[in-house]
């Protein structure tokens, strides 16, 4: 079929005419995935993938979610998902989690599940595949999840409180308003009452047999898919699937999965809500239209629709961002895109989203709608479209170059979507060929014709949701006012957008190149260290982990602790402000346009005792990366519009800080640890006006003007013959300004400190953190001991606080090991949980009990699990460029090799060493900090 006919068919397809579209070619299915279906209807996807090697991911996807619940079952899909981890036919109680952790699968990170409106998915990832018995056991778990979840009365009753705890954690502020608004947004239809977390009254009151009946009704092989991707024998996996799943029967007259339709609305729907915990005034404008039926998603028209949605979204987002920089713009940020209408799959919408400046909700609503109307009337310009095409194709080229280095989850996500909603799954090569044929030939007229269709010109299928901060004296828009704005904007005489583009190179004249003075090779860690003529050092490590990736970092051993109190605020915001500034002769907006289609980026990083840069590129765009490095260190330019927009955004977000329990608690933790210093606290809205742009630019010059202070790291698939001259051109040429900076100590808590306070909130939940802290040498041994100790404690806390007490959705432990101002390590072990207020006083002592028990005798089984997890994670991580950036930086800055002996140290770690570390390093210091936020209901 000729391209002209294809494009005509696409427009017909998008206008809800399917006859022409059905004549178009089908999207090819990737031949490297084995797809099959058993006689009982079970679907399976199996793919061999050896990146990373020796691990695989196991999924079971169900075409079942909250939409399948009856009115008296709201929340059962989610409760059932929880109970899949609390006992099955072959794995009683918590033995499923215990077994998976024993082979290196970490709960939460690698083992989890989620319930959506129309699907429920269970998975465990990065499973070691060197033992066939482990692979077979994992498949047995999938089989149990299919039809063997125990659902004992005891497990159901225990899990009710856990779901309550999750509800307290998730349903806050904006989520609360969405849940309240759904019935009206869906005109009282079923989707309006199927938020996946459900009703707590149903969770509390459902009888065990009711849940079992729901499970039997919907969890059937004809609604399920097994998805296994990784370093596995495909034939063995297929044979095992047939052996385990073929015998599962589908009941006669089994209930059918039926799509729930969403009605059109003849007149506009306006929903305005407010909440005390909402941080910003936000609105969404939906322009509803029919979704593409699943049956047509394998059609080429659907793929082309996705492309057009992508470029339209990127082009209008760029317009919104440019407009937001104008001083009189009433919104802080905005975006638009076409996709599902809220939580439904059977109705789509072109959705506009905006965040208003304080007191400007109506003006912002009009401004965002106006840009959509401008798109409707005039479309986009040729230069805008060219940038969008360039960016899209650069992503396509990057994916193609890395086609053999795709992680398992990139495939499993695609296969879940293919099974549940027939999303296409072409190979990267096939999709790349399609885009290289279509994109250069798809004219702007087709894009603009489609964009015109997206913006409705009547009130039919127009829906607006406004979510605002509840504040004294605030004025909220009415439905009548919003309706009047819509009519006004549609009647306005608009002008076409003018695209102003700077046609200049990033660097007009290349700097005078320096020289590489010395090269030293470290064979143990496989890198080269270059010393340059300006005193800077460069560390190079060539890898083939990703064919099209070069990771970059630069660091110097001084941070914002060097400045006095008068500069704390400026220092805290310096990295963000510098990143939002211009470079050379380019404003931030002009720079975004100039970099379209380039896979290269650099950003500033700044911490108390370190400053630097971080970024990445492809081999093709390595010179752009080097130019950005040079400009970031020599030519940050003032962009007042960008700075003012950033200040407005920060001030708006922080204005309601005192009503946001999460921010209040975070601020309390930081204030307790850093003795109230502004350097560490969450700032107040009133602080933002005191940020001094000129002073930040001066701080930037002091920090980044001394090349000799820096070590630059490049890890990835670079060509050394190409890279070395660029290093001489853009890094060896960097100046030294003579500033001498030195880290200073930041006051930090010591001894026994307690901060217990009360906070009113809508869904009360307590938060507790217990921190044990010390100073010690920065060594590999301390690094391993701190990590292992925290993991052992978390296993205890999950068993006791979550499982036995049902006092929290999650109870965990973390470790911190950071370089301090004096080059020693600041080591901390933290116990954390968001707690049921009624059980908080009972649960908190278990933090200390867990610590005492681990000091006395670490659990031997848990220790072995932790070792397996760490060894597995190390094997996977060490095949990534990011891992090596961290390892080489630690080696260069601290003189500590965290790689070479790591696995042996983990393998040989003894329980007695952990006890000694906790007792004589962590606890002996006597530094213990407790921060507890006790919740009370708003209005009480």
Regions found by a protein language model. Give the residues of each.
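Active-site recognition of the HExxH zinc-binding catalytic motif
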Residues: 74-82, 86, 314, 568-576, ...
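M16 family metallopeptidases and their MPP-like homologs
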Residues: 45-47, 52-69, 76-77, 94-144, ...
């Amino acid at each position: 079929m000729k391209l002209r006919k294809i494009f005509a068919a696409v427009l017909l397809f998008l206008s809800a005419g399917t006859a022409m579209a059905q004549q178009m070619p089908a999207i090819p299915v990737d031949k490297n995935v084995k797809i099959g279906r058993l006689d009982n209807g079970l679907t399976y996807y199996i793919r061999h993938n050896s990146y990373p090697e020796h691990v695989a991911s196991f999924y079971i996807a169900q075409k079942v979610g909250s939409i399948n619940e009856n009115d008296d079952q709201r929340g059962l899909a989610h409760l059932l998902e929880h109970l899949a981890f609390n006992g099955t036919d072959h794995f009683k109680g918590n033995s499923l989690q215990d077994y998976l952790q024993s082979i290196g699968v970490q709960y939460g990170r690698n083992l989890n599940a989620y319930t959506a409106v129309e699907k429920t998915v269970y998975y465990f990832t990065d499973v070691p595949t060197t033992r066939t018995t482990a692979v077979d056991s994992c498949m047995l778990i999938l089989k149990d999840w299919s039809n063997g979840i125990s659902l004992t009365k005891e497990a159901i009753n225990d899990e009710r409180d856990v779901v309550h705890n999750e509800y307290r954690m998730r349903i806050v502020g904006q989520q609360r308003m969405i849940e309240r608004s759904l019935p009206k947004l869906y005109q009282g239809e079923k989707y309006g009452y199927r938020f996946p977390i459900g009703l707590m009254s149903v969770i509390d009151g459902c009888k065990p047999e009711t849940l079992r009946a729901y499970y039997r009704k919907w969890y059937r092989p004809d609604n399920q898919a097994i998805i296994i991707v990784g370093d596995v024998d495909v034939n063995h996996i297929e044979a095992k699937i047939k052996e385990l799943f073929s015998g599962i029967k589908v009941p006669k007259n089994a209930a059918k999965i039926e799509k729930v339709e969403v009605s059109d609305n003849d007149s506009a729907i306006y929903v305005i809500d407010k909440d005390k915990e909402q941080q910003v005034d936000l609105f969404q404008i939906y322009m509803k239209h029919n979704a593409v039926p699943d049956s047509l998603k394998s059609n080429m028209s659907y793929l082309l629709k996705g492309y057009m949605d992508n470029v339209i979204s990127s082009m209008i987002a760029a317009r919104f961002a440019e407009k937001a920089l104008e001083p009189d713009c009433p919104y802080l940020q905005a975006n638009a895109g076409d996709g599902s209408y809220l939580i439904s799959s059977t109705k789509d919408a072109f959705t506009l989203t905006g965040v208003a400046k304080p007191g400007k909700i109506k003006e912002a609503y009009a401004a965002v709608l106006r840009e959509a109307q401008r798109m409707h009337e005039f479309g986009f310009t040729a230069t805008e479209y060219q940038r969008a095409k360039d960016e899209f194709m650069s992503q396509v080229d990057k994916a193609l170059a890395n086609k053999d280095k795709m992680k398992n989850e990139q495939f499993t996500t695609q296969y879940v979507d293919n099974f549940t909603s027939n999303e296409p799954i072409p190979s990267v090569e096939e999709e790349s060929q399609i885009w290289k044929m279509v994109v250069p030939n798809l004219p702007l007229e087709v894009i603009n014709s489609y964009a015109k269709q997206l913006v409705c010109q009547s009130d039919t299928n127009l829906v607006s949701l406004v979510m605002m901060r509840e504040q004294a004296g605030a004025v909220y828009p009415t439905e009548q006012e919003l309706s009047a704005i819509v009519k006004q904007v549609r009647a306005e005489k608009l002008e076409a957008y003018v695209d102003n583009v700077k046609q200049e190179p990033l660097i007009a004249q290349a700097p005078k190149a320096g020289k590489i003075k010395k090269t030293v090779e470290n064979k143990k860690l496989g890198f080269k260290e270059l010393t340059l003529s300006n005193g800077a050092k460069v560390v190079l490590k060539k890898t083939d982990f990703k064919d099209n990736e070069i990771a970059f970092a630069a660091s110097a051993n001084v941070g914002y602790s060097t400045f006095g109190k008068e500069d704390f605020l400026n220092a805290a915001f310096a990295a963000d402000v510098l990143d939002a500034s211009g470079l050379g002769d380019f404003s931030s907006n002009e720079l975004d346009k100039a970099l379209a289609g380039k896979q290269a980026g650099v950003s500033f990083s700044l911490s108390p005792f370190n400053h630097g840069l971080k970024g990445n590129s492809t081999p093709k765009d390595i010179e752009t990366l080097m130019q950005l490095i040079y400009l970031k260190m020599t030519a940050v330019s003032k962009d007042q519009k960008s700075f003012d927009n950033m200040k407005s955004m920060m001030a708006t977000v922080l204005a309601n800080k005192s009503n946001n329990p999460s921010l209040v608690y975070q601020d309390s933790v930081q204030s307790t640890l850093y003795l109230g210093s502004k350097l560490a606290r969450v700032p107040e809205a009133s602080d933002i006006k005191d940020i001094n742009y000129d002073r930040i630019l001066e701080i930037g010059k002091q920090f980044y003007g001394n090349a000799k202070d820096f070590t630059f790291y490049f890890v990835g698939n670079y060509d050394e013959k190409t890279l070395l001259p660029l290093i001489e051109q853009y890094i060896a040429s960097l100046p030294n300004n003579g500033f001498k900076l030195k880290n200073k100590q930041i006051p930090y808590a010591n001894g026994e400190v307690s901060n217990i306070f009360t906070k009113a909130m809508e869904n009360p939940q307590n938060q507790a953190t217990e921190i044990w802290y010390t100073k010690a040498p920065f060594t590999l041994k301390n690094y391993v001991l701190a990590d292992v100790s925290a993991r052992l404690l978390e296993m205890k806390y999950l068993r006791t606080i979550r499982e036995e007490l049902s006092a929290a959705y999650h109870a965990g432990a973390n470790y911190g090991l950071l370089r301090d101002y004096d080059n020693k390590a600041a080591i901390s072990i933290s116990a954390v949980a968001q707690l049921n207020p009624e059980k908080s006083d009972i649960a908190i002592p278990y933090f200390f009990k867990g610590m005492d028990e681990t000091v006395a005798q670490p659990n031997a089984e848990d220790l072995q699990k932790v070792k397996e997890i760490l060894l597995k994670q190390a094997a996977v991580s060490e095949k990534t460029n990011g891992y090596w950036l961290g390892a080489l930086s630690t080696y260069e800055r601290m003189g500590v090799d965290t790689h070479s002996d790591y696995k042996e140290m983990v393998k040989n770690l003894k329980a007695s060493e952990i006890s000694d570390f906790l007792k004589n390093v962590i606890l002996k210091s006597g530094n213990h900090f407790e921060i507890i936020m006790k919740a009370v209901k708003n209005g009480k």
